[in-house]
Structures are given as C-alpha cells and as structure tokens.
Amino acid sequence: MVIQTADVIMPGNENAFETGRRGQISSIADLDESYRWLIEKNVTATLATVKRNGLPQLTPIWVAHDGVNILVNTKKGRLKDRNMRERSDVAILCVDPANPYHWMAINGKVVEMIEETDPAKGSQATDNVNELAQRYINTTPYPLRDPRGEVRVLFKVRPTYVMTFGPPPAG
C-alpha cells in the first residue's frame, strides 16, 4: 500500500496555499508523530461521506487506527453507515483543538465493514467502541447505546491521500 502525502506550508499567491513536501508513506503508522497523535488522542474528527443525492454529509466522530486503517465506529442504520455502505469514498479531518492551523485531512476508501453481530469478527466492533469510550469519555463499556438492540458497525478506511498543515504548538 502506498499513501500519497502533502504538507501545506504557507499562504501562496492570491490567498491560496502552497504545497511543501510531497511524499509517500506505506501506512498510517509511518505518519510523523506530530500529526499521528491527532488520531491517537481524544481529538474529535469530522467524517465526510456522500449522500445518495451527491451532497456531502459531515459528522463529528471518535476516531482510532490499527496502524494501517482508520477505524470508524457507528450505529447500524445511521446516515453515515448507509452512506459508507453505498459509497466507499470518505474523508476525515482532524484539527488540533489547541491550534486550528495544525490539522490533517485523510482521503480514503472503506475496505472492510464489521457488524457486531458477525460471529467471527463482531467482537472487533464492540471492543473498538468500548476502547473509544474509555479514551474520549473515560468510561467503559460504551454507555450511549440504544437499549432497543443497537448494533455497532466498525468501518475500516484505507487512506489513499493525507494532507497535513502547520506544526503543533511548541512546548
């Protein structure tokens, strides 16, 4: 797997941005730590999917990674679930909450979908949502389940392009 990368470094002509380094990495684990932490700490990301009518749909999400894929967990039947099942191209934006000029945008494709009810792999979806709850709200198991039989779905998103901007705050 090869992931194209680009670092946006400074304003260019006519209020556009110039791209600095372009490169390639082989996996999310190869990202520079100054950006990888945006998907390893409790930063709320924004997921962009495409609706049936072609319009974008944005959702704040908790996010993780497995070294290769970005992990997105949701309730079966939600709009983002339906969109990712029908159209596998997505984008994820992670912005440093302390510095809005330090961010990472990831374009990718859904390569695997695991429903909690899958007898072979379903525990991955349950484990992931519980790990996210521990990281983001310091509690486990995930406490916000719909008591009417909610089924969680874990989407594995394979990055195809990563754009980064700005250094993290000093200190």
Where are these regions (language model features)?
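Charged, gly/pro-rich active-site loop segments
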Residues: 1-29, 102-171
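Short, basic/aromatic recognition patches
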Residues: 18-46
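Structural motif corresponding to alpha-helix initiation and N-cap regions
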Residues: 32, 77-78
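A generic structural signal for nonpolar/aromatic side chains embedded in well-ordered alpha-helices
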Residues: 38-39, 84, 132, 157
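Short beta-strand segments
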Residues: 42-76, 84, 91-95, 103-106
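Short, surface-exposed beta-strand-loop junctions and turns on beta-sheet-rich folds
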Residues: 78-80, 99, 171
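Short secondary-structure boundary segments
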Residues: 95-97, 159-160
